[in-house]
Amino acid sequence: VDGRDAVLSGTATTQAMIVDAVARVAATPGIRTVRSDVALAELLKPFPFAASIKSGQVALTGAYPSETAHVALLSAIPGAVDRMQLRSGAPDGFEGAARFGLAALADLDEGGVAFSDLTLTIEGRAKSAAAYDDLQTLSQRAPVGVTVAALKISPPVASPYVWSAKFDGTSVSITGNAPNSALADKLRAAAPDNVPVSTTLTLASGAPAGFEANTLALLENLLKLERGEVAISDGTIALEGAPAGDQVASAVTAAVTA
């Protein structure tokens, strides 16, 4: 302000915001003239917004349409690294969509969410089994106008990574972790038709090298026994059971320790 003359400077995302600001200042008692040096923010189409998490640290990138939205997004993730910039071109519903994306990010311990206008992509690793299940139904809860275009989620890490199979002579029960849902089908298919196989497997990341091949080979050898149990804990394998004779015992032992 120079005497009774005011000059507005800064950046706005719409011409309407500039007109409104000029009108507000002009209505101030004692102000005679108002000059606007406010610049329009760069227009971005599509309008980008992204958030990522790594080693517990969240980073926000892309654009925000107003300082109000900027503050709201930072408040939603306290301590986030802010690399966002003020830009124009945000679609209607941007803030609600961004909050929805940040809520999804809270279910990840590694990965990110990204918007192109109101189209959302999510990729990463779930922080828990419950979070993994929650993310699978994300599109059903999306705000009006938001499209979940891609959802690539890995299950949470299991440590130790465990798996076990028990054969009682007539049926097999399998429990523990699995890197994918297809493994249960492969295990059931590996048993003879007259040996029912029940599986209670939890999806998890962190499987040791060769895990899937090992489970199939171990099940094959377990079924050579009259009864027994085999277990994997990370890279350690344990097998005990009752073989029909010394020849079977030697063959199974050699196969498991190879």
Which role fits each region the language model picked out?
Residues 1-258:
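N-terminal targeting leaders
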